[in-house]
UniProtKB/Swiss-Prot annotation:
Protein name as catalogued: N(2)-fixation sustaining protein CowN
Pfam families per UniProt: CowN
Organism superkingdom: Bacteria
Keyword line: Nitrogen fixation
Membrane-crossing residue ranges in chain numbering: none
Lineage per the UniProt record: Bacteria, Pseudomonadati, Campylobacterota, Epsilonproteobacteria, Campylobacterales
Job description of the protein: Is required to sustain N(2)-dependent growth in the presence of low levels of carbon monoxide (CO). Probably acts by protecting the N(2) fixation ability of the nitrogenase complex, which is inactivated in the presence of CO.
Family: Belongs to the CowN family.
GO BP annotations listed: nitrogen fixation
């Protein structure tokens, strides 16, 4: 085995002990908080909010077996970043950055 091959027991070791479900929940918490301001709400977010999986509201990562919450956050990270930047919300920007770096 060469030095560059990844052994099965070593793959994804860097993701060990990272709670991506919780990271995604924090991003959605911030998104919903920012969207409480009517000036931040638009047709795009009106379509996205109903897509938030039940697992988020239950705060139950075991019910999110397909990782739908993380997928929702990661696939919309560009738009979330734009939303948070426009709102000048550092807390939300930092939460998204952490989730992107650790999980997306």
């Amino acid at each position: 085995m060469s030095n560059f091959e990844i052994r099965v027991n070593e793959s994804y070791e860097s993701f060990k002990n990272i709670d991506c479900f919780e990271n995604a929940c924090v991003v959605i918490d911030n998104m919903l908080r920012v969207l409480e301001n009517p000036k931040n709400m638009n047709i795009y977010w009106k379509k996205i909010v109903p897509m938030i999986p039940k697992a988020y509201y239950d705060r139950d990562p075991k019910s999110d077996t397909k990782e739908e919450l993380l997928y929702l956050v990661c696939s919309n990270s560009f738009y979330l970043d734009e939303l948070f930047e426009k709102a000048e919300d550092e807390q939300a920007i930092n939460a998204l950055s952490k989730c992107e770096q650790e999980c997306c």
